[in-house]
Amino acid sequence: MAEDGLPKIYSHPPTESSKTPTAATIFFGADNAIPKSETTITSEGDHVTSVNEYMLESDFSTTTDNKLTAKKEKLKSEDDMGTDFIKSTTHLQKEITSLTGTTNSITRDSITEHFMPVKIGNISSPVTTVSLIDFSTDIAKEDILLATIDTGDAEISITSEVSGTLKDSSAGVADAPAFPRKKDEADMSNYNSSIKSNVPADEAVQVTDSTIPEAEIPPAPEESFTTIPDITALEEEKITEIDLSVLEDDTSAVATLTDSDEKFITVFELTTSAEKDKDKREDTLLTDEETTEGASIWMERDTANEAETHSVLLTAVESRYDFVVPASIATNLVEESSTEEDLSETDNTETVPKITEPFSGTTSVLDTPDYKEDTSTTETDIFELLKEEPDEFMI
């Protein structure tokens, strides 16, 4: 037992190489009692060292002094101050200082090697890793940074104080770090501790690399990865498709369109001339050059083949439907519109009779020879569908 209340832990170097690090593991588990056992630490140089047995007398989770008992000799020291240090012996003069920054010295050298396994609280998985420290022979004092794994969002500072008596190779520990009590995950952020060692030159110390097996390290909670869903497992988007094609044998297709279908119709023209009104040029799907050339070719073909059957160029600009106008209905539409427009003084009345001749032999736009004329459909139904008057057509 050190007079200053410090546990004294010393070790001797491996026989193979003093710089060969030995591997030690610190486990933080749910158990507060450490059974007596003998552990071997094997370094890369095949140096095997026996570790003394310890048994925990009280709970580590409290902030009062706790004691680890073993079966070795009692050690004495000259200070009675409570500090946060672990003192070692080596041929180098080192000083290990914790966060409180207090330094003490030791006077005894007849100290054997000890290793303390530690279990704190109810943590079932390890939460920290100690880095390898390799002392060189030409450095007197040096700050050693020990970093831990970033395992959470909360910031926890280690302010533990190591005190007590080293009786029969026993050590006392007070103020264990306040680790979270969750078993599934550790909520602890990065914290650093500065350590210095102050040891006599007649002893040798081998600082070990305390590591934790990879299988026991819990994943950091903040490193959450978004799982990409399987594209093949996604449900196919349902798209409602409406087939609005007019069947050849459906003679009442034009008359049976509902009011909800009428709102999509914006322009509906019957064109047979090369000239169109300048105000309606934006309604055509062709450019100015293509429109003029296409219309000229159309009119030339009509002029050369007047005896043949002519079809009506039916344009539904910005419309979603293809309309089929029977020949009889088209003829009746033109004759009726000619009578009404002759009574009004407009510029369009003179051009109406010119369309009667192509309409007399009109076939459907689909050019189907088996198409049946719809004798039950009248021009009134067509205009009710379009909600327009005959004189509004640009002919």
From Swiss-Prot:
The keyword Calcium applies. The modification Phosphoserine is found at S273, S319, S376. One of its GO terms (biological process) is flagellated sperm motility. It is found in: Cytoplasm; Mitochondrion inner membrane; Cell projection, Cilium, Flagellum; Cytoplasmic vesicle, Secretory vesicle, Acrosome. The modification Phosphothreonine is found at T287. Residues 337-348 have a biased composition (Acidic residues). GO terms for molecular function: calcium ion binding. Residues 1-20, 335-379 are annotated as: Disordered. One of its GO terms (cellular component) is acrosomal vesicle. InterPro entries: Ca-bd_spermatid. Its main location: cytoplasm. Keywords: Calcium, Cell projection, Cilium, Cytoplasm, Cytoplasmic vesicle, Flagellum, Membrane, Mitochondrion, Mitochondrion inner membrane, Phosphoprotein. Calcium-binding protein. Essential for maintaining the structural integrity of the sperm flagella. This is Calcium-binding and spermatid-specific protein 1. It comes from Homo sapiens. The gene is CABS1.
